[in-house]
Amino acid sequence: MKKTIAILLVIALAFSVFASGSKESGAAEGKLMLGMVTDSGTIDDRSFNQGTYEGVQKAAEELGLQCTYLRPSGTTTTDYLTAISDLYDNGYRFIACPGYLFAEAVVQAQEMYPDLMIVIIDDALAAGIGPNTVAITFKEQETGFMAGVATALKVQSGDVGFVGGLEIPAVQKFNWGFQQGVAYANANLGTSVNMDPSN
């Protein structure tokens, strides 16, 4: 939900900035066209793709805009850049890219298409954020902390563990926050929960 709201706010801001928009193909009615490129997953993956697409759909619905998504043919930087280019060539001037896997493609696209507004989620673009790019990152450790406290309060005692998705910074930060939340509950809220930090 937090990511969906953040994406909606960025799209609304971009809409206000680019309201004069593109006059090229697909923008016949002067509407900003919102596109999204998925990573290797689908738009119903209950993760990055789905959250991003729900934000794009909600923005399109609330602002009366056109939206679509493309699933690239593969998972390389070239595949992602090709999908971004395909959307751009069809008149999409605002494109959301969910996840760190898009970092290199976004760095290239922001230079290739200066009139394209790009949002990348969960990557701060160490190579540099262009003036037409917004990089959204979250404080996963804070959410993990709350989940750790809630877990400890729910079970009160015994053993708990954490199973994340990929071994990536966002999941690692959530895990660290989760462990700290369990430790906080043990020290301050009367729980006695054991957690093996390696899991």
Features from the language model and the residues they span:
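A residue-level marker of the well-folded mature domains of exported/periplasmic proteins
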Residues: 20-199
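Short, low-complexity disordered leader/linker segments with a strong preference
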Residues: 1-32
